[in-house]
Amino acid sequence: MKSVLFLIGAVLSALASPGSSAAAEEPLPKYGPQARRLFEDRQYFREHEAVDFWALVGYYVPQRNDSSCSLASAVMVLNALRAGEALSAAEELVTQDGLLQRVSSSIWNENTAAGGPGVSLDQFAALMERALAEYAIDARVEVVHVDEADPDALREVLSANEANAGDFLIANFLQSEFTGDPAGAVGHMAPVAAYDAAAGRVLLFDPDRRWYEPYWVTVETLLAGMGTRDGAAGRARGYLRVVRTD
């Protein structure tokens, strides 16, 4: 009887405990195999001018909540576009609150509030055009949906962007494709801060600062993340290219 009770107790204990399989599972690393932290690999900036990186880094801000990555990305790029200007003492830098007030869009205000759905790539393009006008920045916005994977075409865009201080890219992607965290399987946006052509990788200033810091991903990984389908928009994600025209 005692042996039977012992056996029953052992079984119940195993069932009640997270135990063998679940408890033994190792937690996922902060970054999956697709991403490499800037802290671990910054040699590129010792050997290259990296004009976009230096224009953006002073304005690298966190998103305010899980829905406002477009807003934080816009703030970084708008400030970077004005980095070469001599602003007056009365002129504020672009902030997330200030940007929402000046653009005054119900879509941007409501969709980037806590719990909101965020904005699609096409919505973001229209909002960026309004933001450029509000801040009197002479620039155009180009929208590219990655409907077909073409790494060579993307490399050409990245190379031109890296050599030009007057244009910036904002990627729209499925975050889990980069970080490896299945909890991050959501649409996301982040500026491209640098392109290391020799290594075939890009640096992203991910505004999800609660969890991440700047990280590198390969061109192929970038393309895979941008080529995912935005279910709400009904088409593939992609990127914005914002180009000064003056």
Task: Locate the predicted segments by residue.
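Positively charged n-region of N-terminal signal peptides that target proteins for export
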Residues: 1-4
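Bacterial N-terminal signal peptides
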Residues: 7-14
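Active-site-adjacent substructure of cysteine-protease-like catalytic cores
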Residues: 148-205
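Signal peptide processing junction and immediate N-terminal pro/mature segment
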Residues: 17-24
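Extracellular structured ligand-interaction cores
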Residues: 64, 189, 237
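Noncatalytic regulatory segments and standalone regulatory/sensor domains
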Residues: 196-246
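Cysteine-nucleophile protease catalytic domains, especially the papain-like/related folds used
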Residues: 26-150, 231-232, 243-246
